[in-house]
């Protein structure tokens, strides 16, 4: 099991905009280049990459939830 962690503190967004579908859902397959969400810091949005390959087992943060650097965002199983 691998954890995808927030690289920076801020607000985590699971979707690119309120009208669009989430980047990934539980059960989605990801690879290291897959964007799994965005973290907003001071009006700047930073992509969060999976950095691992596998299937999303759980999503630990709600859309628009506050995160700190190192917080677990998702769990991925190989």
Locations of the language-model features?
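Short histidine-centered loop motifs in beta-beta connectors
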Residues: 14-29, 58-62
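Short hydrophobic beta/alpha edge segments that flank linear recognition/processing sites
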Residues: 25-47, 68-78
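PDZ-domain C-terminal substructure recognizer with occasional recognition of PDZ-binding tails
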Residues: 54, 61-73
């Amino acid at each position: 099991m691998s954890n995808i962690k927030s690289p920076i503190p801020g607000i985590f967004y699971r979707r690119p905009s309120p009208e669009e579908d989430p980047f990934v859902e539980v059960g989605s397959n990801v690879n290291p280049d897959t964007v799994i969400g965005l973290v907003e810091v001071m009006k700047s949005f930073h992509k969060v990459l999976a950095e691992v390959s596998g299937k999303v087992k759980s999503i630990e943060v709600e859309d628009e939830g506050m995160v700190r650097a190192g917080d677990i965002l998702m769990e991925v199983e190989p």
